[in-house]
Regions:
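Conserved small/polar residues in nucleotide/adenosyl-binding loops
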Residues: 321-327
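N-terminal glycine-rich, Lys/His-bearing helix-loop that initiates the first secondary-structure elements
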Residues: 1-51
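Active-site C-terminal subdomain of aminotransferase-like
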Residues: 39-40, 215-304
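Active-site phosphate-binding strand-loop segment of PLP-dependent enzymes
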Residues: 140-196, 209, 217
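A glycine-/small-polar-enriched, mobile loop at the entrance of the PLP active site in fold-type I
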Residues: 29-85, 90
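Conserved beta-loop-alpha segment that forms the PLP phosphate-binding cup at the N-terminus of a helix
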Residues: 80-108, 112, 116-120
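Conserved active-site segment immediately N-terminal to the catalytic lysine
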Residues: 203-215
Length: 331
């Protein structure tokens, strides 16, 4: 029997066609001035390079709680379901929809740039009845425009982008959450480019679902997608007729790992969470008011310099330009 197994499992010749002799990686140090990824603090980079520990190690479990609490601070929320998705911001975007959209739900997407279109595409893939209200790229929505669309379409969810990466527009949020409560729908907010960079108040604005990324305003390399879900969205998820149609992003399962039970779901990207913890710690150490002011000061300096080169704002009003992404057009 042993001899037969040895014969059956005998080694085949190794195909060496793809065995290439590459040099060790040697990326240069660059100052990153695009919309993301952004430069990471040396403390964050050092944390990423630490020796991994197990994803159920008591030390890691403690760190998970610290990351959650610091995310609540950054978002200004008390939401219990606040955690970093294992994936980039697009994974967190999909998580907000996968957990709350049921087939036939009307999802109204306020589109004012590329990432509003992505929200609409994703919602449709979860068999939502997608409706859109659109503004020319570089403009933002008024409360009257949004309320008219809510009255017309009667959605289960209004989804919109806070700071639209593709245009630089930062949507004014005062009153939108109240409109959603008035018309009995959830408010889903993309904060990918705004978290850590501009004033952002999830609870005060009555936002029910939000997501972000690690590599922009938080100054951590890409790899995690912060996610937060409020009580109204949690209630909708709990009332689903069937399972969340995405096992990996199912918050009801993830909460068993990130919540008090600490039940294994998947192998978490341990070192990415090391980096996220340090990036969030540095943000809390600086303070949100100071961080927002720093971004504002740097943005105004950049705007002034670009104007001196003969460039003009793509967004017509400076007050609605996203501070960490000043988009310009040549005149």
């Amino acid at each position: 029997m042993i001899r037969a197994l040895a014969t059956t499992n005998s080694l085949l010749p190794v195909d060496d066609r793809h065995r290439k002799a590459f040099a060790p990686i040697g990326t240069p140090d660059r100052l990153l001035l695009g919309p993301g990824p952004s430069n990471a603090h040396p403390t964050v980079l050092k944390a990423l390079s630490r020796t991994p520990i197990g994803h159920l190690d008591p030390l890691y479990v403690e760190l998970m709680g610290e990351v959650q609490e610091l995310l609540r601070y950054a978002w200004q929320t008390d939401n219990r379901l606040t955690l970093p998705m294992s994936g980039t911001g697009s994974a967190a975007m999909e998580a907000t929809l996968a957990n709350t959209v049921e087939p036939g739900d009307t999802v109204l997407v306020a589109v004012k740039g590329y990432f509003g279109l992505r929200l609409a595409d994703m919602a449709g893939r979860y068999r939502a009845e997608v409706k859109t209200i659109e503004k020319p790229w570089g403009e933002w929505f008024s409360l009257d425009e949004l309320e008219a669309a809510l009255i017309e379409h009667k959605p289960a969810i209004l989804a919109m982008v806070h700071a639209e990466t593709s245009t630089g527009v930062c949507q004014p949020m005062d009153g939108i959450g109240d409109l959603c409560r008035k018309h009995d729908c959830l408010l889903l907010l993309d904060t990918v480019t705004s978290l850590g960079g501009v004033p952002l108040y999830i609870d005060e604005w009555k936002v029910d679902l939000a997501y972000s990324c690690s590599q922009k305003g938080l100054s951590c390399p890409p790899g995690l997608g912060p996610f937060t879900m409020g009580p109204r969205a949690e209630a909708k998820m709990s009332a689903r007729q069937g399972k969340v149609p995405n096992w990996y992003l199912d918050v009801s399962l993830l909460n068993q790992y990130w919540g008090s039970d600490r039940v294994y779901h998947h192998t978490a990207p341990v070192n990415m969470n090391f980096g996220m913890r340090e990036a969030l710690r540095l943000l809390a150490e600086e303070g949100l008011d100071q961080a927002w002011a720093r971004h504002r000061s740097n943005a105004e300096l950049l705007w002034s310099g670009l104007e001196s080169l003969g460039l003009s704002m793509h967004v017509p009003a400076v007050s609605y330009t996203h501070l960490t992404l000043p988009t310009r057009a040549v005149v």
